[in-house]
Amino acid sequence: MKNSQDIRSGFKAQRYSAPALNIARCTLNVTRVLFIILVCLSATTLVYGQEEEGGEIESVEIEIVKVKQITMPKANRNFEKVPPRPADPLAPSMTYDFKSIDFAAPDYKPVVKPLRLKDETLSKIYGNYVSAGFGNYNSPFLRGSITSKRNAEKFYGVDFLHHSYGKGPVDGEYSGMGYSKLNGYLQGMGPKVTADLGLTYENMFNHYYGYPAPKPESADDIRQSYNILGLNAGFTNTKTSDFNFKVSGDFSYLDDRFEASESEAGLHFNSRYEVNKTQAFILKSDYILVARKDTKVEAKPRHLFRVNPAYEFTILDRFRLSAGLNAVVENDSVGKDKAAHIYPDAWIHTELAKTVDAYAGITGDYEKVSLHTLARENQWLNSNVGIFHTNKSFEFRGGVQGKVARKFSFHVGASVINYKHLYFFVNDPLDRSRFDVVYDNAVRLNLFGELGVVHGDKVNISLRGDSYNYSMDKLDHPWQRPSYKVGFYSSYKIVDKVLLTVNMISQGGAKAYDNEADKVVTLKSAMSLDAKVRYFISKPLSVYVEGNNLLNNKYPIYQFYQARGLQISAGVSWSF
């Protein structure tokens, strides 16, 4: 009990100040902690004792004595608040007066001045040019063109060309030749129709130098000259539309140095009507009138009328087809069984790849043959030769063409044509320097391949090869016609001011009949290698050096007509 009283007296309620109370609480907390530690130690001892003595609890008396008392002084508290700062009155006092203000601004009339740009200087157009040169074989060269510039409503101009050889491969002036052409043209463009008009004059002269020895007394005795005067006119729609057309007409008159003359007139119509993107109707038509006169040939009109309708359409978005016919009416007398001829005209095109197309088709036609045609192909014609149109009664043609890697293009194919009265050249038995014309039926197989390479403006190459095989009806051979042709054409821009062109032409396998030896001969293969280097002194002015037949081959053009050997020429060109 004494202990209990001591404990109670130690915790007698007293009034302490705040610091004293905090210290008392801290002391009490320490005392409690010590008490708990002692209890735990006692319990451990008791447990241990129980384990050793069999679990009996010994009676223990604990006495806690608190004798220390902490006394803290009383704290002084100040409960006085800070008074607010007095506000100073405004002097003078402010008054507010609100008034409505009407603001009327005048109408704004801006003056916009467009930006004045300097007039752009138009680049000079070098549409006119003149080129002149001279070479061995006494060969002057002159070529030029003068045209209008920057006119959206009309275009006109004049072209001229002269190239002659005063001497040739046989007896100098006895084998001279030349060609001249003067061409004037005018074109007017309206909003709906564009019309054009042209006038042309040509002169071709040569010598019959395929004579045997001795040579004639005068070169003028064997000179042949053709003069051709031509006129053409036409009109077409100016803007491309669903219906496009072109109508044209032409007239040409030819005479030679002797007594042959020929008039040729033609009317041509070409139209296309687009139904939609996959269908179209096409109509082509021609009428040609030819009249020739010679010492033994009376002027007789030869008519050739052709009409070719066709329908184009697309199926399966891949195949483009054209189905039509070609109807021809003519009045030639050779091999004539009927005046009217009808041929199928059907074609199919398909896309094998994005840039590769294949095509095939069958057709037929009548090919115009006149003195104009033969004289341009062979200037050593005899007088009074027979002239008839060629009936191409059947033709099949197919091939594949396309581009590879944008720089390479190719075209390979084959054609089979059945000709009726196809013309061939044979030497006159009485005068071997002149050629007669004979006709025969023939089937010709042509295999061809073409390759092109374009690399910007640096390189441009074209190579084509043709193989011909003839199956004749009556003639032993296709006289004077080659069995193969190879052509190589290229241009190279070596540097900015130097342009090189290299061309090569080769043909061979042609056969001819030698009347003097009474045997068939195979003409020597022809190969001509040509090169030209042009140096640009400035943009409008350049000079050139040209070499033809650089291999100096003495190959025959036709039997007894030898080609010129090495030819070198140089000249200057000026654009303005």
Q: Where does each model-flagged region fall?
A:
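Flexible loop and strand-edge segments within Gram-negative outer membrane beta-barrel domains
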Residues: 165-181, 196-246, 250-264
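Outer-membrane beta-barrel translocator/receptor signature
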Residues: 110-113, 121-130, 134-170, 174-182, ...
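Surface-exposed extracellular loop regions of Gram-negative outer-membrane beta-barrel proteins
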Residues: 148-168, 280-284, 300-332, 456-464
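Transmembrane beta-strand segments of Gram-negative outer membrane beta-barrel proteins
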Residues: 90-110, 116-136, 153-160, 241-247, ...
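Residues on the lipid-exposed face of transmembrane beta-strands in outer-membrane beta-barrel proteins
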Residues: 144-148, 158, 184-188, 231-237, ...
